[in-house]
Amino acid sequence: MEKLDKRREEETYLWIPVQFLDQALIAVLKCIGLLCQPAKKTAPSPVTFNQPEEQEEDYGVALKDDDVVVLLRDNKAKSKKRDKEKPSSGRPGQTNSVPNAAIQVYKED
């Protein structure tokens, strides 16, 4: 019994690196699109008589004589345009001083 338990532990210990590589390979193949696992089939849910029928929503697709026509709707929110911020005329870290010419203009008024 102890030998069997020890053997299972060794098998599990030896499987860990292979399991990591297996999972990494599966993930890479899924990203590339080469691995397509078959879809699991599930049983349909039971239908009750009191349950309302599902209504299909129109997502902008219309069918005409075996052709698909895409209808576009303009429901996009438009953002307000802002004016660009004007950079300050001073150097970073210093306060802006008023030039002497501007002071003389104000004194004349």
UniProtKB/Swiss-Prot annotation:
Keyword Kinase: no
Residues excised as propeptide: 1-73
GO terms, biological process: defense response to other organism; innate immune response
Family: Belongs to the brassicaceae elicitor peptide family.
Biased composition regions of type Basic and acidic residues, renumbered to the chain: 74-88
Function (record text): Elicitor of plant defense.
A Pfam match: Pep1_7
Annotated protein name in UniProt: Elicitor peptide 2
Site residues, Required for ligand-receptor interaction: G90
Sorted UniProt keywords: Plant defense
Disordered, as annotated region: 74-109
